[in-house]
Structure formats: structure tokens, C-alpha cells
Amino acid sequence: MLQPIITLFLTLPFDHSQQLFLVSLYNLVKFTSPAFIFGIVFTVIRKNDQQAKLPLKSYFSDQWDNNFFPTFAWTLFYLIAMPNLQQHGHFHNIATFIWQFFSDNATPHLWYSVMMLQFLLIMPGIKSVCNWVQHSYRRLLIAVISSGIIYFAWLIFYDHFILNGPEATHWYLLDRIFISFLIFGLYGGLSWNFHHEIQTFLFTYWWLIVGFYLLTYFRTRDLFLATFKLTDLANDSYYLPSMAIYALAVILLIYLICIAQKVFMAKINSFSSFLCLSSIFSQCFLGSYLLAIF
């Protein structure tokens, strides 16, 4: 929610230092979409870990109820109740209404819904890759490196032709196809296969993760401030290699925080159990003592 709010604030007459603070905050939270994609795929693979394939009937039934239908309903609401929010033109007949509906041009933020729904559709394929990798480090390297090459090659192509290129207007729909977030979805699924090893690594080398996060944050912030106008947030895109690396750093940091929370809560629960047992033993001792007296 902060991203559109900050974008709105930057249209107000703030001085340079205030704009710098808002842009830095915007850059700080520019990770949410990759992190959500990672978390969604991680969760689906975790829940279906004991099955060779996704139970397609129940899986797609659940996804329709939880994701597809709400997305379609909100899109319809935006087009009918708030038509002024449309992007890339406005509908003026049935054909253009259908186009605006399915291209998710109804509002600026619906591009992410299209992205998420695509990953839900290709989830059986991601599950197949995770099953193929299983717990093989060699296959893991093959999957990680090959998908990384495809992904960063795509980012270079996107940057050259669309983000800062001649086809920004004509090829704008390419900002919402799944390949633009490929590694976040695939790495999310593969992370479950190796979650014990990842947890051990992150908990052991937490200082490295924190340092990596800080380095990538200040690097992406400096790159943006040195290259673009402060108020031109459209160029602070997910589809830059530096932002992709930053998103991965944030995902690792969130993963680390979750592990730390789990360990902390386990200690709290153990301490609570100890206090409970101590209370029981104290009551038993007091009862025995009173019986002995009387």
C-alpha cells in the first residue's frame, strides 16, 4: 500500500530533502510483488510435499474460490464503478470492455493480479520441476542457473526494448507475463525442497544476510538517485537486475526473520512449559506438606 501512497505524495510540492526521504522509503518497500510470488509458490509446494502431482481438481477449485473469482469481481467493479482508473485507454464498447477486463488495465495495480494468476496456472509445472530436483544438489544447480540465465537475459531484453526502449507503448503488456518474475516463483518452490539446509545456513550466517541486504538496498537507492529524477518512480522498476537482486536479498532477510521468530517462540513455549511444570510441582509439594502437617 505504501507504493501508491508515496507516488501520490510525490505529486505534492515537497522540498528536495522530503522528496529524497519519500523516494528512499519507496525504494525500501520495492520488493513486495517478488516476495509474494515466492511465498505463494513456497506455500503450495509445502502443502503438497507428500504428493507426486498436484491434485488438479481440488487445487484449481480452491484457486478459483480464493484468487480467480475475487480478481475477476474486483476488476469488474473497478471498470463499472471507477472507470477513470483505467490504464492505456478507456473502453467504449463491448470489445474494448473485454480487452480492458482481461488485460487488467482496469487499475494501475491489477498487473500484479495477472502475474499471480499466471503462477497459479503454471504451478503444476513448477511442482514437476521440484519433483525432478528432489534433494539433488546437481539438479538444483541446473535449475537455479538455467532459470537465472533465462531470467536475467529477459531483464536485459526488457530494459533495452521496453523499459527504456522504443517499444514501451506497444509492448507494455510484457510487464505482466510470468517470465518477469520467473526466479521468484521457481526459487520459492525449490526452497521448500531444501528448507532445512536453508534454515541452517541463514541462522548460522545471519550477519552475512543482513550485510547483503544493506549493501543491495543502498546500491539500488544510489543507482536510482544518480540516474533518474526523484519524482520519476516509473523507472524504479522491478525489471532491473539491481532490483531483482535487492528483492532476493529481502526474501532472504524475511526468511531469516521467520526462522528467528520460530526459534524465539520455541524458547518462549519451553519456558512457559517450565513455569507450568514448576507451578504444578510447587502445588503438589505444598499439598503434601499441608497433609503432613495435618
Where does each model-flagged region fall?
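Alpha-helical transmembrane segments of multi-pass membrane proteins
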Residues: 1-11, 78-87, 151-157, 220-222, ...
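Perimembrane loop-to-helix junctions flanking transmembrane segments
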Residues: 11-23
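Interfacial loop-to-helix transition and helix-capping segments at the boundaries
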Residues: 22-34, 101-115, 158-184, 219-252
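Transmembrane alpha-helical segments and their boundary/interface "anchor" motifs
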Residues: 26-35, 46-82, 91-108, 119, ...
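Transmembrane alpha-helical segments
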Residues: 37-44, 122, 126-129, 184-195, ...
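Membrane-interface helix-boundary motifs at transmembrane edges
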Residues: 49-61, 127-139, 193-206, 259-273
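Hydrophobic alpha-helical segments with transmembrane-like composition
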Residues: 78, 82-86, 94-160, 175-185
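Alpha-helical transmembrane segments and terminal signal-anchor/GPI-anchor hydrophobic tails
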Residues: 197-293
